[in-house]
Amino acid sequence: MSVVYKGQVIDSELSKNSFGGTEMMRERLIKNVDPKWLEKCAIHFSRPRQLFEDVINVLYCHDLAEDPENNILANGGWKKFDHIVFVSAWQRDQYITRFDIPYSHTTVIYNAVETQYEPVTKDVETIRFIYHTIPHRGLELLVPIFDTLAKHYPNIHLDVFSSFGIYGWEQRDEPFKQLFKRIEDHPNMTYHGHQPNDVVLEALKKSHIFLYPNVWKETSCIAMIEAIKNQVICIHPNYGALTETAANATIVYEYNEDPATHANYAFSIAAQVLKVQQENPNYFNRFTYSDRYNLARNNIDSFTNVWNQVLSLLVQNAESKKEDIIYQHSDN
């Protein structure tokens, strides 16, 4: 979708108006990774359009392996890249199985967020739910689930930050307009559309539960990482890379393909959490005061260190090969 070539961004038509998770990682890469390594590389953020002969080519995959854009990797096409970086081990294994890529040609670098886990005692008079990812990943299940929960627990509220507008694709919101209207008309729900990330982060500070009946396989989930770091209880299925992303800091239930069964699972667990909170007002704060919420591997320092290690090794290997070629020519 875009490429960081010698430290400079080259956008595509798809990426130029987008500020989703991929673009966040691109910004953090440029901001934090040593420029002397970036200067010698082209880092392709999925869907590469052009390879460069004068630098090292690294493919930075954020998409699912089955995305048709990845057919470039088939039949040994992965060899066009000097290295491939993935955002989760689950995602990496999907690509390796599909395209027969050697493990040694890959690295997993977990997505990083700038938020630090700094636990505070949150006000629990109103239990605030939040949904802060794009609509097709589970909002259609969440709204009726929450509507039923609100009939039993009137002190809950749902804030929805959700729109394809974050990618510059407002037209893709059209199938969800009635759902958005249902949210707007509900006294216990608020629809915020798409907002800058700093606005969402402020909302997360006041939120208690990220109920995420996910129906779209994700290779990682930045929304969940940011929620955990902001001391939010996350409830979700064991689908795609969500369990790996969660790193034992969430409440996980079995994924089910049937929407009604899936919704029942999510509802039951959320209702149980609310019941326990109602009986024990200290439950939420006790649950979220835990070192498991720190997610150290998703810190900027960890992200930066691994990128520096990977790129420095690639550069050193490339320079060593050049020296060997020069030496061989001199012998001849």
Question: What is each model feature region?
Answer:
Residues F19-M24, A260-N264, Q278-K322:
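A charged, aromatic-enriched C-terminal amphipathic alpha-helix characteristic of glycosyltransferases
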Residues D82-I96, I101-E118:
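Donor nucleotide-sugar binding/catalytic pocket of nucleotide-sugar-dependent glycosyltransferases
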Residues T121-G138, V143-F146, A150, D159:
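Conserved donor-binding/catalytic core segment of Leloir-type glycosyltransferases
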Residues D173-Q195:
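Nucleotide-activated donor-binding/catalytic signature segment of Leloir-type glycosyltransferases, i.e.
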Residues K205-T219:
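Acidic donor-binding loop of glycosyltransferase active sites
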Residues I233-H236, T243:
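Short hydrophobic beta-strand element within catalytic cores of glycosyltransferases
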